[in-house]
C-alpha cells in the first residue's frame, strides 16, 4: 500500500504542474490565437491585409503529432492519480477522463477544418480548448480534494 505522506507529496507536485499547465496553456492560447473565433480563424486561414500567412496541412501535422504524445501522456499521468482517489464515483472518473481525451482530440484536429475554410471549426477550436482547460481544472480540484480527504481519513 502507498504511504499517505508519499501519496500526498506526489499529488502536491502533480497539482502544481496541472496548475502551471492551466495558466501557461491559457496564456499561450490568448497570446497566439486571441480570444475570439474570428481571431483563431485568421491565425490558421491567413489574412493578406495583416500579412498573416495561411497555415499548411503539413505544418499543422508537424504541430499535431507531438501534441498527441504530450497531451495524451499528460492526461494519462494526471488521470492515473484520479484512479487512486475515492472522492468521485467510477462513472464520474470515466466521464472526466473520456471528456479530457475527446476535447483534446477535437482541439488538435479543428485547425484542419479551418485551413479548408470552414469557419465553424474556429468556434470548435475555441470551445474544445476552453473545455479541455476547464476539465483539467476539474481534475485539479478533484485531486486537491482527494489530498485532504485522504490525509484526514488516515
Give residue spans per PLM region.
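Membrane-interface helix-boundary signature
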Residues: 3-10, 54-57, 89-96, 115-125
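N-terminal signal-anchor transmembrane alpha helix
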Residues: 5-35
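Perimembrane loop-to-helix junctions flanking transmembrane segments
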Residues: 38-55
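Individual transmembrane alpha-helix segments
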Residues: 54-77
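Cytoplasmic juxtamembrane regions at transmembrane-helix boundaries
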Residues: 77-100
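Hydrophobic alpha-helical membrane segments
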Residues: 95-111
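Alpha-helical transmembrane segments of multi-pass integral membrane proteins
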Residues: 108-154
